[in-house]
Amino acid sequence: MRILVSNDDGFHAEGIQVLATELRKIAEVIVVAPDRNRSAASSSLTLVEPLRPRHLDNGDYCVNGTPADCVYLALNGFLSGQVDLVVSGINAGCNMGDDTIYSGTLAAALEGRHLGLPAIAVSLDGRQHYETAARVVCDLIPKLHHQLLNPREIININVPDLPFEELKGYKVCRLGYRASSAEVIKQKDPRDETIYWIGPSALPEDESEGTDFYAVKNGYVSITPIQADLTAYHSLLSLQNWLEQEFTK
């Protein structure tokens, strides 16, 4: 098996280095990751400046672009040979609920899906036990049936920040919800000009049983299938009925 590994924290991040080391025990691994932290880049692509992949001494690649750039460029540009799976992570911090909208970690996996490959995104609910998350991924990959690694979807994994032996197991979950966050931090820079920082994420609003928030909070690894189709199917019929009523009067 040949695995392409990327992330949004940058090639230097501890999470991706631990993940690549562990994955190399079960597969051939190619790392192509951003040259700096690109957290919350979502699925943005760089269209207004050239991308420059740099081949590092250890064989990895870093790119002056987003997570989606890295996967797109690797698979369509400079990598030769077949890739069987895309794995993105290990993110420093969870990607649950509404986090998935902004996440560059998920975006790298979704780009692999868009290019026809099965893909996994993995995040740690903290910054300590990266080895735990890496072991979880290596444990799951051989066990996931081929049909579960559907190129039309990705698997989103969130791991409690615990020693591996303290994990309670795995739970398949739906996404929860966070409360709306409107915090912006206003400061002055050294030139006395006003600057702003986007504030931290809000607390979970829906962390009921069955959600990813609930699973991780209670010591379980959450596993959530994610699709790129954003159609609100439950609203199609009512919207169609409204349209017919409004325009057939």
UniProtKB/Swiss-Prot annotation:
Sequence similarity: Belongs to the SurE nucleotidase family.
Enzyme category, top tier: hydrolase
Annotated EC: 3.1.3.5
Cofactor: how bound: Binds 1 divalent metal cation per subunit.
Localization per Swiss-Prot or TrEMBL: Cytoplasm
Function comment: Nucleotidase that shows phosphatase activity on nucleoside 5'-monophosphates.
GO molecular function, one term: exopolyphosphatase activity
Name the record gives this protein: 5'-nucleotidase SurE
